Every structure is written in structure tokens, then in C-alpha cells.
């Protein structure tokens, strides 16, 4: 059977950038484990803050963490109380100085992670899986998506045999490297077990910018 490559991994270095922007030699393993611990802490503390992407950069004894969120007010808190508490915990965890930057996601309906999270929460609230998917697709298309595909798999409606069911609208060209495709998968904990949610969103083509050559007039 044909398998699908991860759409984001395939585009890293072409139209996507790395989530961790640092280089290390002997300390690589330590930095990697530290990054994983940072991500785990943030995802636990800000589970309801619609955080889609966590980027890390490093300097000497300093870590810069950039959070992409649809709810910046919830991350910052009253007078910055929440972000200060998070910074203090990250400082303690890493033993380094941690700087936190917050970037607002203007269109959460075009973010695969947030769309998948929304579908998963609806499934946990016992909303029909077909309805949850179709509503998410309608919202994404209204927000300006060129195409979207969703899939829910597991014991749908408590069926004895697990299956996968998905819907799509528009085009989702997975083979086109210049196509800006956002992909994410989430899990929903239901009374019948876990359901997997996958979302692919095609946001249009990223055209390569012409690089100026020295001496070119």
C-alpha cells in the first residue's frame, strides 16, 4: 500500500523552516532533550491557549522561545502574570535565561493544528464526527483556504471495527513542493477509546523570490 510522506517534513528547506534554529556538536543530545522538555512543559501549561507552533533559538546560556498562538491574551495573562510564571518555570527547567516571544495567529481556521484540535474537542464532547469535519471544512474554505482534507479514524460511533472516514474540498496537491500545505494530527479521548484526527490545509502556492545577483542592473 502507498504511504504518505509527512507534508511539512518534505517541504523543510524548500518553503518551510526548521522549528529549532540552533546548531550544536557535542551538546546536541542535551539540547535536543532540553527542547523536548521545553515543548512538553509549554503544551501542558498552555493546553487551552491554542498554541500551534513552538520555535526555539539558542545563544550562549540563552534560549529564545517563540509561541504562535490564536489566544495571545491567555498566554500573556493579566499584566503579563502568566508569561512571567511560564518564563520562571522555563528558567528553572533549563538553568538558562529564557526569552519568550508571542506571535498571534490571525486566521486560526487556516492552521491545521488548531483545526485538528477543534475537531478533537468536538469528538470528546460527543458531537458527530461527520458534522465536526464538515463544519471545520466550511470554516477553512470561508477563511480563504484553497483546499482542505480531514480524516477521523478509530471506533467511530462506538463501532466494534475501527475504520477511517474523511472529507475534502478544493485541491490539496501533496506532490507540489511549492504548495503551502499545513498538516497536523491530533487525538481525541472518547469513551470507546482514542480517535485519530488528521488535517491537511492547502493555503496557496509560495512563489520563489528572485535573488539579486551582484553586478546585475
Curated annotation (Swiss-Prot):
Keywords: Ribonucleoprotein, Ribosomal protein, RNA-binding, rRNA-binding. One of its GO terms (cellular component) is cytosolic small ribosomal subunit. Residues 38-106 form the KH type-2 domain. Gene3D superfamilies: 3.30.300.20, Ribosomal protein S3, C-terminal domain. PROSITE patterns: KH_TYPE_2, RIBOSOMAL_S3. GO terms for biological process: translation. InterPro entries: KH_dom (IPR004087), KH_dom-like_a/b (IPR015946), KH_dom_type_2 (IPR004044), KH_sf_prok-type (IPR009019), Ribosomal_S3_C_sf (IPR036419), Ribosomal_uS3_bac-typ (IPR005704), Ribosomal_uS3_C (IPR001351), Ribosomal_uS3_CS (IPR018280). It holds the Pfam family KH_2. Binds the lower part of the 30S subunit head. Binds mRNA in the 70S ribosome, positioning it for translation. Belongs to the universal ribosomal protein uS3 family. Part of the 30S ribosomal subunit. Forms a tight complex with proteins S10 and S14. PANTHER family: 30S/40S RIBOSOMAL PROTEIN S3, SMALL RIBOSOMAL SUBUNIT PROTEIN US3C. HAMAP family: Ribosomal_uS3_B. This is Small ribosomal subunit protein uS3. It comes from Lactococcus lactis subsp. cremoris (strain MG1363).
Amino acid at each position: 500500500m502507498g504511504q504518505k510522506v509527512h507534508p511539512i517534513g518534505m517541504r523543510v528547506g524548500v518553503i518551510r523552516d526548521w522549528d529549532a534554529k540552533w546548531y550544536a556538536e557535542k551538546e546536541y543530545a542535551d539540547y535536543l532533550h532540553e527542547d523536548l522538555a521545553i515543548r512538553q512543559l509549554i503544551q501542558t501549561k498552555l493546553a487551552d491557549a491554542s498554541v500551534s507552533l513552538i520555535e526555539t533559538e539558542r545563544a550562549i546560556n540563552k534560549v529564545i522561545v517563540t509561541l504562535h498562538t490564536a489566544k495571545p491574551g491567555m498566554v500573556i495573562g493579566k499584566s503579563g502574570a502568566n508569561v512571567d510564571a511560564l518564563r520562571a518555570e522555563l528558567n528553572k527547567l533549563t538553568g538558562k535565561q529564557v526569552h519568550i516571544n508571542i506571535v498571534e495567529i490571525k486566521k486560526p481556521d487556516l492552521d491545521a493544528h488548531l483545526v485538528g484540535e477543534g475537531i478533537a474537542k468536538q469528538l470528546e464532547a460527543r458531537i458527530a464526527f461527520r458534522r465536526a469535519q464538515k463544519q471545520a471544512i466550511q470554516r477553512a474554505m470561508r477563511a480563504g483556504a484553497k483546499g482542505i482534507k480531514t480524516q477521523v479514524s478509530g471506533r467511530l460511533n462506538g463501532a466494534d471495527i475501527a475504520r477511517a472516514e474523511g472529507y475534502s474540498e478544493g485541491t490539496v496537491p501533496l506532490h507540489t513542493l511549492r504548495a503551502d500545505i499545513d498538516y497536523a494530527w491530533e487525538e481525541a479521548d472518547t469513551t470507546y477509546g482514542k480517535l485519530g484526527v488528521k488535517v491537511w490545509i492547502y493555503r496557496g502556492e509560495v512563489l520563489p523570490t528572485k535573488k539579486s545577483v551582484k553586478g546585475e542592473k
